[in-house]
C-alpha cells in the first residue's frame, strides 16, 4: 500500500512539474476560459469613490488586494469614460505602502517571505512605489492619515511624491461620504 501511495505521489509530482510546477489561483487542469455574457452591464457616467485602505491583505504573491482593486477601478473608469474622483485613504497596516524607498527600508521589518526581521531593516525599497505612481498618473488621489503618520514619526519627506496627508483617516472618509462619495472598504 505504501508503495502505491509513493508511486502515486511521484506520478503526481512529475505531472505537476511538467505543467509548470506552480499552482496558481486557477486550477492547472481547468478547461480554457469559456465565452462570458454580461447580463448586467454597468455604465457609470460619473462616480466619486473613496477607498478605506487600512488593512493589508495579500493576494497570491506579494500584491495587496487593495492595490489590485484600486488599479482595476481606475482602469475601468478610464475605459468606460467615467468622470469623477477616486480617493485612496491609507492608514493603519497599509500605510507603509505610501513610504519612499529610504523610509520603507528603515521602517519595514517584515521580509518578503512574511518573517519578522527583528535585527534589521529591509533593503529592497518600496516595491509598491511604481504602482502608486501609476495610480496617481491615472488620477487617483493618494492620501495618508495624519494620525498614522504621527504615530510612526513620519514626515512629508518620508512619503512618495504626490501623496497628500489628511488630518485623520476616519474624519476624512466621513467628510468624503458626506460629500456623496461611495465608500469601498477593504
Regions found by a protein language model. Name each.
Residues 1-4:
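Positively charged n-region of N-terminal signal peptides that target proteins for export
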Residues 6-8, 22-186:
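Secreted/extracellular ectodomain signature
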Residues 10-20:
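Bacterial N-terminal signal peptides
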Amino acid at each position: 500500500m505504501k508503495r502505491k501511495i509513493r508511486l502515486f505521489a511521484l506520478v503526481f509530482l512529475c505531472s505537476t512539474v511538467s505543467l509548470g510546477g506552480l499552482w496558481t489561483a486557477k486550477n492547472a487542469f481547468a478547461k480554457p476560459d469559456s465565452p462570458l455574457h454580461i447580463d448586467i452591464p454597468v455604465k457609470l457616467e460619473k462616480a466619486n469613490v473613496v477607498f478605506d485602505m487600512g488593512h493589508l491583505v495579500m493576494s497570491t504573491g506579494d500584491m495587496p488586494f487593495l492595490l489590485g482593486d484600486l488599479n482595476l477601478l481606475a482602469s475601468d473608469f478610464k475605459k468606460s469614460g467615467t468622470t469623477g474622483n477616486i480617493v485612496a485613504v491609507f492608514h493603519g497596516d497599509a500605510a507603509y505602502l505610501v513610504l519612499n524607498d529610504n523610509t520603507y527600508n528603515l521602517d519595514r521589518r517584515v521580509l518578503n517571505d512574511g518573517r519578522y526581521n527583528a535585527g534589521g531593516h529591509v533593503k529592497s525599497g518600496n516595491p509598491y512605489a511604481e504602482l502608486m505612481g501609476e495610480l496617481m498618473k491615472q488620477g487617483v488621489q493618494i492620501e495618508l492619515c495624519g494620525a498614522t503618520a504621527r504615530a510612526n514619526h513620519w514626515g512629508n519627506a518620508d512619503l512618495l511624491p504626490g501623496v497628500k496627508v489628511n488630518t485623520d483617516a476616519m474624519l476624512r472618509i466621513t467628510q468624503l461620504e458626506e460629500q456623496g462619495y461611495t465608500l469601498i472598504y477593504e
